[in-house]
Structures are given as structure tokens and as C-alpha cells.
């Protein structure tokens, strides 16, 4: 179902949600960190979703083992590099990797700005090695509160030229976007793009708030948008992108089944929705699975899947010239 004549993108992909189980095992041994299992086979159920989780917060606990083993900046650099290697193996031409430096730093009190630098270095080296094009999106983990998010923002701004956009992720219900207005004002002043996790756990009002108050140009997940016809019209008219993550939304119990997923409705309504993975290592999926298995199960026709692939580049945080160059590169391959 992937059109090989078009660029393949993944623009909603958490770097810190894509730490390989083998890497968790390796780093656990290297730093003498107690893990819930001593073999790869036994570890996987602890670090990968093997069935549907009851809610988003339960799903997010599966991510914790990946960051618990980040005991050095070199470890952060390694997982960043491996993220690009994984993208190349999946056949991705362009990837936007988002990461929460405070979350990655937390378990071992690493310097947050140092984590940002390590991720930048690892991604750069990976791109040079594997020929994938990538951009970085900084995440503020709202679950840890306003002050912690300010620390993350300051660390990201210290490397502002290497960061493309700012995101807000975590407990959407407990920490609404209204708490972070000043944070996003600073991000926009820095010239960054804005994408926000919204309409995943909370309703359409969370999406409206992300757009109107935080300046969101894209929405992560946004599944609740279909509950508000005016919002759907607005998204289509204003060309605000939706970063859809099919398998993830089922695993977090955000959507009951793939057949119930709103991606098809988004596309039928003219909303610029794209196909993405979210947390591939934790979910046990890759972008190929999303196109070949999840999208057809969600009722998408071949042409709708192709449109979602086109949308992925259309709403990417790239200039028109960069998009054109990527299209030409893939077409000539």
C-alpha cells in the first residue's frame, strides 16, 4: 500500500518511545540497573504493549523502562542514532523525531541541556550514516508540571537552531494547554513550528485551545475532532494537519477498534491527516505495518492511503523547497 514513487514520512514518532528492547537490556547490564527480566524474550512483555492498555497513562508506563537505563549522555546519543537506523530500515525518507529531554534525564539526573545536545549529535550522526532526512521536535512533558516544562523549554532553546518545533505531551486531562501559554509564546518567538497532542484523552475543546491559544499548526492524534463539525471544517479550511497513529490509538484505548478510527473520516472531510507510528518499539509496530495492515483495517481505500502518504510530506515542518527536493530525490531513485 506504500507508493514507492512518493516520499515515505513519519512525522509523529517519539524518539524516547522507540528504544529497542535489546538496547534496554544492553544498557541495563552496562550500568548495573535492575531490570524486570534478564533475557530479551522475558523483557519484551515489560517494555512492549502486548494487549490493549486501559488508558493512555497505563500505556505511557511501558515507556518508562526505556528511559530508566539512560544513565549517561552517551546512552542518549546511542538511542538517538538507533532511531535513525530504525527509520532507514523501515524505508523512511523523512522523519520528525520528538523527544522530552526532561523525561530522558529524570531517572539519573542527567543535565537536561546535555540530553538535548546528545540527541542532536546522535541524530546527526545517524542521518550522515544512513541517508535519512530528519528534524527534531522538542516535547514538554505536561505531566510533570509547568516548572519542569520550563526547564525543558530552556534546555531546548539553548539549541534552538537544531530544533524545528515544540510539542506538549502527557496527561492531557490533568494538565490542560492553558497552563502553558507563556511557554508557547517563547517557542513561537524563537521561530519554531508548533504541534500539540490534543483531542486524544480530552475532547474537541482541547484541540480548539491548542490552535487558538498555543498556536498549533498540527495536532497529534486529534481523534475527538470528529465530535465537532465546526472544528472539522476549520481543520480542513485552515490546512491544520492531523498526525494520526492508528495502532497507538487502539492500544491506549483512545479508540475502540481500527474500524472505529476517524482517519477515514478526516480524509473524506478534506483534513490533511497523515499516517504515523507514535512509539514503535513500545507498540511492536513499524510504519510498514501501519500502511499495510492498520490502514486497510481502518477502512481506508488504496487511494486514501496514498493521500495520507502525500499529506505526510505536505504537513511536514519543511520549506516548500525542501519538500520539492525530497519529492525529486525519491522520484529519481
Swiss-Prot record:
It holds the Pfam family A_deaminase. This is Adenosine deaminase. One of its GO terms (biological process) is hypoxanthine salvage. Its EC number is 3.5.4.4. Keywords: Hydrolase, Metal-binding, Nucleotide metabolism, Zinc. It catalyses: adenosine + H2O + H(+) = inosine + NH4(+); 2'-deoxyadenosine + H2O + H(+) = 2'-deoxyinosine + NH4(+). GO terms for molecular function: 2'-deoxyadenosine deaminase activity; adenosine deaminase activity; zinc ion binding. Zn(2+) binds at residues 12, 14, 197, 278. NCBIfam families: aden_deam, PRK09358.1-1. Substrate binds at residues 14, 16, 170, 279. InterPro entries: A/AMP_deam_AS (IPR006650), A_deaminase (IPR028893), A_deaminase_dom (IPR001365), Ado/ade_deaminase (IPR006330), Metal_Hydrolase (IPR032466). Binds 1 zinc ion per subunit. Its cofactor is Zn(2+). Belongs to the metallo-dependent hydrolases superfamily. Adenosine and AMP deaminases family. Adenosine deaminase subfamily. It comes from the Bacteria. SUPFAM superfamilies: Metallo-dependent hydrolases (SSF51556). GO terms for cellular component: cytosol. The keyword Transcription regulation does not apply. The active site is at residue 200. Catalyzes the hydrolytic deamination of adenosine and 2-deoxyadenosine. The keyword Magnesium does not apply. The record marks 221 as: Important for catalytic activity.
Amino acid at each position: 500500500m506504500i507508493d514507492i514513487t512518493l516520499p515515505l514520512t513519519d512525522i509523529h514518532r517519539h524518539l524516547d518511545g522507540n528504544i529497542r528492547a535489546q538496547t534496554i537490556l544492553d544498557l541495563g547490564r552496562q550500568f548495573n540497573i535492575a531490570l524486570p527480566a534478564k533475557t530479551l524474550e522475558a523483557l519484551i512483555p515489560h517494555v512492549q504493549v502486548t494487549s490493549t492498555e486501559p488508558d493512555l497513562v497505563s500505556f505511557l508506563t511501558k515507556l518508562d523502562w526505556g528511559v530508566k537505563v539512560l544513565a549517561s549522555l552517551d546512552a542518549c546519543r546511542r538511542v538517538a542514532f538507533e532511531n535513525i537506523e530504525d527509520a532507514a530500515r523501515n524505508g523512511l525518507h523523512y522523519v520528525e523525531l520528538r523527544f522530552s529531554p526532561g523525561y530522558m534525564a529524570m531517572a539519573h539526573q542527567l543535565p537536561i541541556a546535555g540530553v538535548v545536545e546528545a540527541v542532536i549529535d546522535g541524530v546527526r550522526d545517524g542521518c550522515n550514516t544512513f541517508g535519512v532526512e530528519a528534524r527534531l521536535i522538542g516535547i514538554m512533558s505536561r505531566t510533570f508540571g509547568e516548572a519542569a516544562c520550563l526547564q525543558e523549554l530552556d534546555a531546548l532553546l539553548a539549541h534552538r537552531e537544531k530544533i524545528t518545533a515544540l510539542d506538549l505531551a502527557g496527561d492531557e486531562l490533568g494538565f490542560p494547554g492553558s497552563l502553558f501559554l507563556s511557554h508557547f509564546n517563547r517557542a513561537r518567538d524563537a521561530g519554531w513550528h508548533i504541534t500539540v497532542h490534543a483531542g486524544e484523552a480530552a475532547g474537541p475543546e482541547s484541540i480548539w485551545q491548542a490552535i487558538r491559544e498555543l498556536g498549533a499548526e498540527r495536532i497529534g492524534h486529534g481523534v475527538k475532532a470528529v465530535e465537532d463539525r465546526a472544528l472539522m471544517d476549520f481543520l480542513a479550511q485552515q490546512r491544520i494537519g492531523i498526525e494520526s497513529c492508528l495502532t497507538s490509538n487502539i492500544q491506549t484505548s483512545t479508540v475502540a477498534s481500527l474500524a472505529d478510527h476517524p482517519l477515514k473520516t478526516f480524509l473524506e472531510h478534506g483534513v490533511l491527516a497523515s499516517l504515523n507510528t507514535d512509539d514503535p518499539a513500545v507498540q511492536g509496530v513499524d510504519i510498514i505495518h501501519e500502511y499495510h495492515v492498520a490502514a486497510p483495517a481502518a477502512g481506508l481505500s488504496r487511494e486514501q492511503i496514498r493521500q495520507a502518504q502525500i499529506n505526510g510530506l505536505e504537513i511536514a515542518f519543511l520549506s516548500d523547497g525542501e519538500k520539492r527536493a525530497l519529492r525529486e530525490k525519491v522520484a529519481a531513485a
